[in-house]
Amino acid sequence: NRHIKVWNLSLGTSIDSSLDDFSDFGMALDNIQDENNVLIIKSAGNCTNFTRQLPKSRIAQSADSVRSVVVGSLAHAKGPYDYAEVDAPSPFTRIGPGPGSIVKPDVVFYGGNAGMNAGKLEKTGIKSFSIDGTPAYNVGTSFSTPWVSRMAAELTHLVKEEFDPLLIRALLIHNAKYPANNSMSMTDKVTQMGFGAPSSVQEMLYNSEDEITLILRDTLEKGSFIEMFDFPFPESLVDKDGNFVGQIIVTLVTKSLLDDKQAGEYCQSNIDILFGTYETETDRDTSKKGIKNPKGLEEPQNILLESLYSARVKGAHPFTGFERECTLVKYGKKFHPVKKYAIDLSEMTTSNRQRYCLLYTSDAADEEDSV
């Protein structure tokens, strides 16, 4: 059934994923997706640690699949004995990070709530149906995952192009947000909710009158990069002093080179993205080795850095639900196949922002990497 491009996988193991090595199950799922050009939406797994007042278990083996969109669970409601508040991670949902510190789960959606009453498990379930087709209620990441699978399938149907799993993953993650009423630290948000809960498909495909979305798709050879000068920016987002304002969300999803013989270094390529200001354009000597672009940048500055923003402004934007704190995710030197940044230009501590450029750089152990 290779014509079926989106697959829901609401099953897994009860064994925690390693912090260092990727599981055979997870790597097999990656291989299936590469060989068949399909996308698997995979449950993060459940744990019962909350029934014994223990910390949550990490994602199950198989949920460490790099290519899959791994889904955790949020509480949709709160019963009298449930532990989680509405829009908080469900008590049973497994958490990240994945091996090599990659962000897993990728996203979350509603999968129910649970708690204990005098030693008895109490559940507030999601409506589903049983084998005989009758309505049923239950909890688990097995029930949050199909919601995201449906979104992925709908996107596939509505995007009138050849199926591209990278594009579907990017749309889901780019349009994911953290619940505005959640007060968890940024570290806990990423660990338990990945990049957040995806918006509706209509919101993913059709911007509001206050938004613009650019999608860039290309393949980079080892050691190469792509530069964009004078990045397009609406005049309405330039204030009376000539400074840029507004929110920027940047999502980078790559088809990393994978090598199942390299244990914790399973991801063999990395792409970084820099977005920022520069002083002037300069001429470059293309006769020199490695220089292909006759134009270069003088004093470029990456604005996707925590140090450029005020720590005093916190919380969600009142209209968009936008969370600046995404900027605080530090990817370090690890190879991350998915990276997301969210910034609010009004919170910058420096005022001279005249132009923006976009720069991709590739650091690969092999020949090329898709983005």
PLM regions: where:
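Extended low-complexity, serine/threonine- and proline-enriched intrinsically disordered segments
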Residues: Q247-G321
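Secreted peptidase-domain scaffold signal
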Residues: K189-E281
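Substrate-binding/access-modulating region of protease and related hydrolase catalytic domains
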Residues: N1-S65, P135-V139, F143-T145
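Extracellular S/T/G-rich loop segment that most often corresponds to the catalytic His/Ser-adjacent loop
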Residues: R58-S149
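An often Trp-containing, charged/polar helix-loop segment at the C-terminal end
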Residues: V159-M184
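Single conserved hydrophobic/aromatic residue that forms the stacking wall/gate
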Residues: Y360-D369
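Extended charged low-complexity segments that act as oligomerization/scaffolding linkers
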Residues: N1, T51, Y81-A88, K104-P105, ...
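Short glycine/serine- and small hydrophobic-enriched flexible loop segments
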Residues: F109, S149-L158, H174
